[in-house]
UniProtKB/Swiss-Prot annotation:
InterPro entries per the UniProt record, alphabetical: Ribosomal_bS20 (IPR002583), Ribosomal_bS20_sf (IPR036510)
Family the entry assigns: Belongs to the bacterial ribosomal protein bS20 family.
Protein's organism: Roseiflexus sp. (strain RS-1)
Cross-referenced Pfam families: Ribosomal_S20p
Gene3D superfamilies associated with the record: Ribosomal protein S20
Superkingdom field: Bacteria
A molecular-function term among this protein's GO annotations: small ribosomal subunit rRNA binding
Keyword Cell cycle: no
Name of the coding gene: rpsT
Official protein name in the record: Small ribosomal subunit protein bS20
Keyword rRNA-binding appears in the UniProt entry: yes
Keywords attached to this entry: Ribonucleoprotein, Ribosomal protein, RNA-binding, rRNA-binding
UniProt record, GO biological process: translation
């Protein structure tokens, strides 16, 4: 229970930010899932991978996820994409 007006405002602001962060994190996860689904289906789509990487970068810049977390997830996605494109003749 907040004892001061500023503490009450902090609670409201934290709730808003948590919701915003949750929405952004969800967008990132969805983009990664779409890209991976395309890769595993045998139709690797560079545009989906690029979008997922862009969202990861933006989330890291905004402080929603740690920069190393974004780098690791981008690396793994790029590795899967490279493996799929090398395996499938275009």
């Amino acid at each position: 229970m907040a004892n001061t007006k500023s503490a009450e405002k902090r609670i409201r602001a934290n709730a808003r930010r948590a919701l915003r962060n949750k929405m952004y994190r969800s967008r990132v996860k969805t983009a990664i899932k779409k890209a991976e689904r395309a890769i595993f289906a045998g139709t690797p789509n560079a545009e989906l991978v690029r979008e997922a990487m862009s969202l990861l970068d933006r989330a890291a810049v905004k402080g929603i996820i740690h920069k190393n977390n974004a780098a690791r997830r981008k690396s793994r996605l790029a590795k899967k994409f490279a493996k799929a494109t090398a395996a499938s003749p275009s």
